[in-house]
Structure formats: C-alpha cells, structure tokens
C-alpha cells in the first residue's frame, strides 16, 4: 500500500506548496476499511511537514526537541479536501471514517487540539456508501423490486467531490469472476455490468472497476490498482486491453510471488493514466521485501508499438486485442520468438468451450 501511494502521489506532489496540495483529489472507489485512504492521507501530511521544515519552520508545532509536526487544523484540511472513498458496504464505510479520524488525531495532545474546534471533522461528504459501478440512471426503467434496489445501492457521483473528477484513484478492487457475479447478484445488476465496455465473455469484476476508475479521473489523473496479472493474456480481457493499451504507464509484475495470505493470486500493480504514452515502464518483482525496501530493479521501458505479444498471435502487437507477452527478460523473449514457428495453438486443433473447473469445496 505504501509503495502504491508513494509511486502515484510523488509525481503529483512534486513542486507543489501545501496550499496547492489541498487542491488534489484522491479516491478509493472500493475503499473497504480505508487502508489506502489512510496511507494517502499520511503521505500528504508527511509531504507538507517536510515542505514547512525547508521553507517555513515556524508554521510547525514543536512536540519535543527535534520533533516537529503539522498543526491539527492543517491535517484536517488535508483530510476533508483531499481524501474520498466509496464502498457498497455501510459497515466498511463507517470503519473507514473511524480509521481516518483515528489517524487524524494520532500523536495529538490536549494542548495541540485546543485551537482547532471541532476537533473531529464530519466525513459524511468524503466517505460515501453506494455501488461505484451502478448509477441511478443505470436502474431507470428496469423492472426491479425495492429490495433489489436497496441491495444494488446505485450511487450518484454528483454527491461526492462536487461531481468533479479525481486526480488519483487507488486501491484493490474486488476480484469476482463472471460465474460468481451471477450467483451473488440479481439478473438486473448483472445486466447493468454487461453494459460496460470491458465486460467480455468470462470477465472479472475488477475489469469494470478499472474502466470506471478511468472514467472518474481527470485529464492528468492516474489510476493505480493491485489486480491479478491474468488480464495480460486472458481472452476475456480483450476489451480491457484495448481500453488501456495507449494509456498504461507502469506495470509491476509479481509473477508467482504471493502477496495475500491463504489465497493464490498472481498479482500486478497496474498504473494507467488518461494521456497516451509511447513506452510501458515494466519490471518483475521476485521478492516483496525488496519492494518495501525500495531495492527492486529499475523499470524497463518497453515501446508499445510492436510490444511482444503471445508468440502464437501472428503479427500481433499491443495495438490489437491479442494477449500480451510482457517481459524484461530478453533471453526468454528470444526463446519464445524462436518457438513461434513451431507452436500450434490448442484452439487450432479442437474447439474449447470451457477451461478446467476446480473442484468445489463442498465436495472436498
């Protein structure tokens, strides 16, 4: 989380003054308990603190010898101006607000809060409950019950941040495959999800969150998500790849390294903007500890035009919907290219209707 926040906010904060920082708008549209929002808030507080140390030390409060901190009124301004979140779970929303308020008063003392009343700001306008993927317009004209409407929780984006777009959307969106979407949601809700341009074949719900995030960031904005790396090559992600191909900025690929306990997920950190970039900054991460300690290899800049794709996709590149073979290993890429002429796709031999199905836990 720290790594994602730093990588996303650092270029946006560079060269700004604390008053200019207050114009930044950062959101997590599936915020859960608010972990990403807490970290984003702390990054901005630390940035402003360091700025004042260099430019106006008298603005800071001296806690003890050698320790200075930002006044509570400044921290409140950062929280209420810059940090926004949405989640469909009302309990998660309340936890997120509570966590942010605890973070706000961290290391505060009775004297330090006396000049800032009320001590705790109201975050009702910052952290909202609703379905980030469904708007009121989406459900208009649909024949759905009031119970279904309550469960769907359509969200009006005019109700947050004044309806304006965000500078950064960051987070860890839910991963839900199509068959589970159909089990967990009503037909009406599934129908709405299928209107998304990235909903193709056996799509995953995180595709939709990527698409929605790109719609919600401003012209210079960035989206940074941790998502499974299968979107690089699965057929269901064809439309998503087409959607992000020109605007993908960075990709940290963890390969087989596992980030989540008790779950086998092949993860990546995906950063996408709104403007076209010619080269993809790519690197593999083979040790999570190195990432936290900033000891990972530098990014390889891979030209998007002619970016290596799956070798059995004849004459393919990043400008079509073919699977992407992204690697910074030149030896591996060379081997794959040499094998291209000899590889026969299984799809050229048989008709494939579904992949191998894992055994349901109910039968184990």
Predicted regions span which residues?
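Surface-exposed beta-strand-to-loop junctions
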Residues: 75-79, 187-190
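Extended charged low-complexity segments that act as oligomerization/scaffolding linkers
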Residues: 73-76, 124-125
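Conserved SAM-binding motif I beta-strand of class I
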Residues: 85-86
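Class I S-adenosyl-L-methionine
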Residues: 1-72, 92, 136, 140, ...
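Signature of N6-adenine DNA methyltransferases within the class I
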Residues: 38, 45, 93, 97, ...
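Flexible, glycine/threonine-enriched loop-and-boundary segments that flank and lead into catalytic domains
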Residues: 13-24, 76, 136-170
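Short coil/loop residues immediately preceding or within conserved phosphate-binding loops
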Residues: 21-24, 80, 204, 267
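Conserved SAM/SAH-binding beta-strand->alpha-helix loop
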Residues: 89
């Amino acid at each position: 989380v720290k790594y994602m926040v730093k990588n996303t906010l650092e270029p946006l904060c560079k060269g700004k003054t604390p008053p200019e920082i207050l114009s930044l708008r950062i959101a997590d549209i599936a915020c859960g308990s608010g972990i990403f929002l807490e970290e984003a808030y702390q990054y901005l507080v630390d940035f402003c603190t360091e700025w004042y140390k260099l430019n106006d030390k008298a603005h800071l409060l001296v806690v003890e010898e050698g320790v200075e901190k930002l006044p509570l009124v400044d921290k409140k301004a950062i929280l209420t101006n810059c940090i926004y979140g949405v989640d469909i779970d009302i309990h998660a929303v309340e936890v997120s607000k509570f966590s942010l308020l605890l973070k706000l008063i961290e290391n505060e003392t009775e004297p330090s809060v006396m000049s800032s009343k009320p001590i705790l700001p109201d975050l009702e306008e910052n952290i909202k409950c609703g379905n980030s993927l469904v708007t009121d317009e989406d459900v208009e004209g649909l024949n759905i019950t009031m119970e279904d409407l309550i469960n769907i929780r359509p969200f009006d984006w005019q109700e947050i941040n004044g309806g304006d777009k965000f500078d950064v959307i960051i987070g860890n969106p839910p991963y839900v495959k199509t068959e589970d979407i159909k089990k967990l949601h009503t037909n009406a809700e599934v129908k709405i999800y299928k209107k998304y341009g990235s909903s193709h074949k056996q799509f995953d719900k995180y595709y939709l969150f990527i698409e929605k995030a790109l719609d919600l960031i401003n012209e210079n904005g960035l989206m940074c998500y941790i998502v499974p790396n299968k979107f690089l090559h699965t057929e269901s992600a064809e439309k998503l790849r087409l959607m992000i191909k020109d605007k993908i900025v960075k990709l940290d690929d963890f390969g087989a390294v596992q980030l989540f306990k008790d779950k086998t997920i092949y993860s990546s950190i995906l950063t996408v903007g709104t403007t076209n970039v010619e080269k993809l900054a790519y690197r593999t991460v083979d040790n999570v500890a190195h990432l936290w300690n900033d000891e990972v290899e530098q990014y390889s800049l891979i030209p998007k035009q002619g970016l290596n794709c799956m070798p059995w996709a004849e004459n393919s590149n990043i400008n079509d919907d073919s699977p992407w073979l992204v690697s910074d290993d030149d030896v591996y890429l060379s081997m794959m290219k040499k094998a291209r002429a000899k590889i026969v796709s299984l799809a050229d031999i048989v008709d494939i209707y579904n992949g191998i199905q894992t055994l349901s836990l109910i039968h184990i």
